[in-house]
Amino acid sequence: SFYGSWIDVKSLNKIDKKDLFKKTTEKGEFYFLKKLSKKINTFDLLQEQTPIILDKIQWQKSMKWGNFSLNWARPLKSILGIFDGKNLDFKFYHLKCSNITFVDKEFEEKKKIFKNFKSYKIFFQKLGIIIDQNLRKDFIEKRLKKISGRRNIIIESNNKLLEEVTDLVEQPNILLCKFDEKFLSIPKEILIITMQNHQRYFPTFDNKGNITNEFLVVANNKDLKGFIKSGNERVVEARLNDAQFFWKKNKSQNLVKQVSKLKTMNYFKGLGNYFDKIQRMRKLGGMISDELLISKEKVELSASICKVDLISDLVGEFPELQGILGGYFSEAQGFDKEICQAISEHYFPLGLETKTPKKPFSIALALSDKLDTLVGFFGINQKPTSSKDPYALRRLALGVIRLIVENNKEFKVKDLISYAISLYRDQELKLFNESLQKELTNFLLERLKYYMKEKQIRTDIIEASINSYGIDHINKIYKKAVILNNLINKEAGKDIISSYKRASNILDSELKDKQLELSNAADPAIFKNNFEKNLLKKINELRKYFANINKDENYSQSLINLANSKKAIFEFFDNVKVNDEDKDIKKNRLELLQMLCKTFDNYINFSSIEMN
């Protein structure tokens, strides 16, 4: 089949197969055809398309000015457009494109005419303005590295912030600033967010990873008198003064005594308040602790106080630090280290990039929080659609997958979901989605598929793995798929698939009319040759191997054992006629093939795996 733009039947008949090439997409493998489009004059194209493109630009906030109908982020005075020395001639609302623009030169707007791009570039170079965004970004990055190297401080890589400041300046100048060392007693995350998110500064760290009181500012001009430097230092110290006040106040407030205040804080309509949520998390976390063989009391205590930071002033100022600040508050009040860490990490992982909690108490608390949320929102039908996910449930479900897979654990997810549902009902909170268990299970498996695709695992292997095992075997599904994916294009992988396909193709053909019933047991008494005996011997060896596997299957060894059966399988097919005239012999040989396929299926169902 073809993929891409529509090709009519007449055109299709004129295409030579040698002109096509294959390409794998998310929807499968397709043939593609390269077509040359007709030649278009670039100048004409720019003149025609530029106003259309400008009109399609969307702004989060826009404004009108004067009597003009144009909506834009800021008032526009002119449009400069030159290509190959020629002026573009088009209208955009009340503005006409020309070779004239207005330059802010020493706080006075002056009209400026340009003949070509070269004159435009030279003019701004003389003003110290870097018009090329990539060059400007490169200049800023090099200056940041130079100053930090000279001061023996480290700047963490942050391309998003770098891109942002690159767009905010045209005449970049990097300034080294400081704040009072007394603020280093504040949690470093507060310092980082204050500088990075609120002020767009670059925080710095020493060689041990500790934050320092120095930061770098990307200014838009030279700071000859030091006013820009001192101004930025005043701004950050004012913010940190407020943060320090709230930090001292909040860390001393007794967490346990404040738990009851969560009763006044609604969680979500139909799902109770935050006090209700932590009661559910306590019980669900207790069930998870049984599977992890850790202290139920510690998990329950962690759950009881993990949301108290939501009522603090600091979380009001820094909402992105909820959980993390709870960890700091519990540490300041002398709680067990494992409890503090669990609280600090219970929102993680977020998406694909952030860290995954590794400690058992952190895993238990993070899983209980995520599963409770997923059950609640699916229960009241607040599910994601194809285009919208306002409550980030996909991210939460991905977090569940990562907690299981990246910690090499296995949980009875089906039972956890059932128990979470019962906890809502115990609180007389109505979950009216009758298909909740099934829908949430499928949703989690879809997120597992997404995770596996991001790990570059073949689609057919993903489908085969998921179809072979249920929701209680997430880790097994992933690990088996990874090992097979790594082997599939090697000789051993090809041996496995070719061996399986030779048997399954004959079986499928013989069983398609459903007139023949097989019992998955061949009778050695009616074997006619050693090839049948050798194949049965190999099957029994494989069966014994899989029967003796407990929890810890060596997936690589399993595949090697399957690959090593190729010789017996191919010798059987090369020397034995399955479709024998004697019906009993034919059926017995088909039984042998069914035994072979079902033995291979102990790893995964190979029927949907494609041959290369």
Predicted regions and their residues:
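Amphipathic alpha-helical "coupling" segments that flank catalytic cores
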Residues: 1-612
